[in-house]
Amino acid sequence: YKSNGGLWSLAYNRILPQGQFLSPREWGREDLFSFQKRERSEGSADNHALVLNYKKEFEVLKENLNLMSIISIGKHWKPEVTDAVLNKYAMPDYTHINLDIFFNIKKIKHLKPELLITSKIGNGDFPDNPNFYFNKVDLFHLDFIINYNF
């Protein structure tokens, strides 16, 4: 939905229990409607994902700098972490929040720095074992990326 304030989108994705989403990482990012940066549905069956996105562009310095921000909040329901058949990588249910800011520096045409702030919060009950949450949920991740497009 496009409004004067920005662009809104709501996406839902369902992977049935009889199937499993398999996508080699070499192929790049997943092309699912519910995709969020630093999120993977690969290896999941019986999976639900609901994601709300808000995109806004605004001027910071009229002649020098524009920003584009994308905020996304997603809720991802996964099978039990102990069910290796349906949940290949033992990923628990989680809430995923991203803030992605792109800097458009007008005087440097092809340079597009990006700041990505990500948080994943584990939801539900899962065994108190680091294999089920370490580098998967209950984390905060910050990236500063230098994009240069030729």
Indicate residue ranges for each PLM-predicted region:
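Transmembrane beta-barrel architecture of outer-membrane proteins
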Residues: 12-14, 48-50, 73-75, 93-97, ...
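Outer-membrane beta-barrel "beta-signal"
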Residues: 52, 136-150
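Flexible internal linker/loop segments at domain or repeat junctions
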Residues: 22-44
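Membrane-embedded beta-strand positions of outer-membrane beta-barrel proteins
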Residues: 8-10, 54, 67-71, 101, ...
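Outer-membrane beta-barrel translocator domains and adjoining extracellular loop/strand segments
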Residues: 20-26, 79-87, 125-132
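Short loop/turn motifs that connect adjacent beta-strands in outer-membrane beta-barrel proteins
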Residues: 4-5, 59-67, 105-113
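Transmembrane beta-strands of outer-membrane beta-barrel pores
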Residues: 3, 12-18, 29, 58, ...
